[in-house]
Structure formats: C-alpha cells, structure tokens
C-alpha cells in the first residue's frame, strides 16, 4: 500500500471536518437534502432500527516485500525488512484468530474482505472464517492499485482473487473492496460482469443505496474511515480508549437519527491492528454497548445488499 502515511494524514484532516458544527456547513448556499419527513419510507425492511456492519480485513500475507509498517521506511534495496514482515505475520498468527473468538463470544457475524494471495498463503484460516459463518468478500489478488489497470488486466486481477477465495473456502464472493477504495472507471462494470452484487468503495452515505451499472441495479454498502482502525489507530495514533470513545459517539448519533430514518453504521478492523489484545478488548466494549440498545442488528454486507435490492423505498442514484 504505497503512500499509506500520506493517505492517513489526509484522512486526519478530513476527520477534523466531521467535528465542525453542522451550522457551519449551512451558513452559505449549501442546501442539505432532508429525508427526515419520510419516516415510513426510510426504515429497514426487516424491522431493524439500526444496522451495524463490521468488516474484518484479511490482508496479511498478501503484502508486497518491504510493505509500509510502523518501522522507518529506510530499507536499502536488496534487503528484507524482517521486523516489518513480522508485524504483518501477527495479523494471521494472532490477530484474526483472536477476532474470530471475539465475534463468537459476542454472537455476531462479520464480512471479511480477503486478499487472494493472503488466502492462498493461509488457506486453513481463510476457510475457518467462512466455516464460522462469516462472509468472504473479495479484496483483489494482492495489494496492487487497480484504478489505472486496463479493462482486461483489472478483470483478471479481480477474478483471480475471487477464484482463490472460492478454491480455498468454497464461498463465492459477491462483495468487493478495492485497495484503499480506489476503484477505476471500469471497476463496477467488471464487478457486475463477474457476478458481484455490491461494492463498498463509497463514503457518501450512512445507508445502502442502489446505482445503475449498464442499466442494471447494483448495490452500494458504504464503508467507513471514521470508525476504522487503520485510520484512527495506525494513522492518528489513537489509544484503544480514544477509539472506543469515537465509535460510541458515532453510534449514539446514528442511533438517534435512526428513530426517523434508515441508518447503517460501519466499523472496520484490520488483521494486524484490530486483532491486538487491547483492540479486541476495545471492540468487546463497543459491541456490548451497542447490543444494549433496542432495535439494533448486526449484518454481513451481503445481507445488507440483499435488503437494499428488496426494498422499494431504497435510495436510487
């Protein structure tokens, strides 16, 4: 993931914008669209008041040599960053197994975005994720950027990742997440052609919606940077307590809004970050807090996409 630190710095600035009072956004000529008066049309079809979507990124093992890590990026060419590699190894040796046990203890199912090469390197772990009832979604074959790939090259890149997941787990991925969300102008057409039903590379809403791709409906299940460990913990150096506080504040606001409109909350964890002892403890506190509230359901992203397709009141763009 090249330029990761630059990306994280930029998202830090974007996060500050989210702390501005809403009145500051409305002082000019900006007209905020409102659907608050459409109570009966914007609830979840299954009766949920608020739906929470948890992501577990399975990337470790698929990273390139000398990928960015917490260590200084000053390795000379021709040498291997051994401690950096061990940081990634933690993701599949300790991180995902610990998170899987935590999901079981909490009684929730998540969506795991799997890098194809990581799956092939750790097939037993990938299969265990699916065997425990979680969704396997595609995340490319490796950490390459795909936005600049020619059509057929990108199609093969995506399909190779899907095939790896299918071969190892028996699960056919229907959801997609590009490297750093950076899809290209051809990506959605390719996904539709390959049989995908949704993608998550969009930050524009706090609820799912449908778009048209070559005249056919395609679901968008929005992702998050605000409740994302790679942005907050690795990027902004949040402590576990700060992470808990921010995610709880996000939930409280969305839960309040969900009394009047359809709301989705997304939380994202990465194998080598979200799977550390303190972060799993923080996650347990967050999920337990959310579960204390009536009307909240936890759903895999493929389930959310299916609800979107079946809902006549879903937003269409």
Residue ranges of model-derived segments:
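Twin-arginine (Tat) signal peptide motif
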Residues: 1-8
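N-terminal export signals
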Residues: 8-27
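Active-site-adjacent pocket scaffolds in enzyme catalytic domains
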Residues: 31-46, 159, 163-260, 315
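N-terminal regions that are enriched for targeting/export leaders
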Residues: 34-87
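C-terminal domain-boundary segment and adjacent tail
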Residues: 35, 198, 210, 248-317
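Residue-level marker for buried hydrophobic side chains located in beta-strands
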Residues: 52-54, 136, 297
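Metal-dependent polysaccharide deacetylase catalytic core of the NodB/CE4 family, i.e.
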Residues: 78-80, 97, 104-185, 208, ...
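Alpha-helix N-cap and loop-to-helix initiation/capping positions
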Residues: 149-157, 238-242, 278, 282
């Amino acid at each position: 993931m090249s330029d990761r630190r630059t990306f994280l710095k930029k998202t830090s600035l974007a996060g500050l914008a989210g702390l501005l009072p809403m009145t500051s956004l409305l002082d000019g000529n900006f007209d905020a669209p409102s659907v608050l008066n459409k109570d009966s049309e914007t609830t979840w079809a299954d009766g949920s008041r608020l739906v929470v979507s948890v992501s577990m990124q399975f990337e470790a093992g698929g990273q390139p040599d000398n990928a960015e890590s917490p260590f200084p990026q000053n390795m000379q060419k021709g040498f291997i960053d051994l401690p950096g590699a061990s940081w990634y190894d933690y993701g599949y040796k300790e991180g995902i197994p610990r998170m899987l046990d935590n999901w079981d203890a909490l009684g929730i199912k998540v969506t795991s975005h799997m890098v194809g090469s990581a799956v092939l390197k750790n097939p037993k772990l990938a299969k265990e994720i699916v065997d425990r009832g979680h969704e396997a979604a595609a995340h490319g074959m490796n950490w390459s950027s795909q936005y600049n790939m020619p059509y057929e090259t990108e199609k093969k890149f995506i399909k190779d990742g899907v095939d790896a997941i299918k071969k190892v787990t028996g699960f056919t991925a229907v959801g997609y997440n590009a490297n750093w969300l950076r899809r290209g102008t051809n990506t959605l057409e390719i996904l539709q052609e390959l049989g995908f039903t949704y993608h998550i590379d969009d930050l524009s809403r706090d609820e799912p919606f449908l778009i048209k791709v070559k005249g056919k409906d395609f679901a968008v299940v929005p992702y998050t940077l605000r409740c994302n460990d790679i942005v907050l913990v690795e990027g902004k150096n949040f402590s576990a307590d700060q992470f808990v506080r921010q995610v709880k504040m996000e939930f409280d606001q969305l839960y309040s809004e969900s009394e009047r409109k359809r709301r989705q909350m997304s939380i994202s964890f990465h194998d080598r970050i979200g799977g550390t002892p303190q972060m799993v403890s923080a996650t347990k506190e967050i999920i337990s807090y959310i579960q204390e509230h009536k009307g909240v359901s936890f759903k895999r992203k493929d389930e959310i996409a299916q609800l979107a397709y079946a809902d006549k009141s879903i937003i269409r763009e």
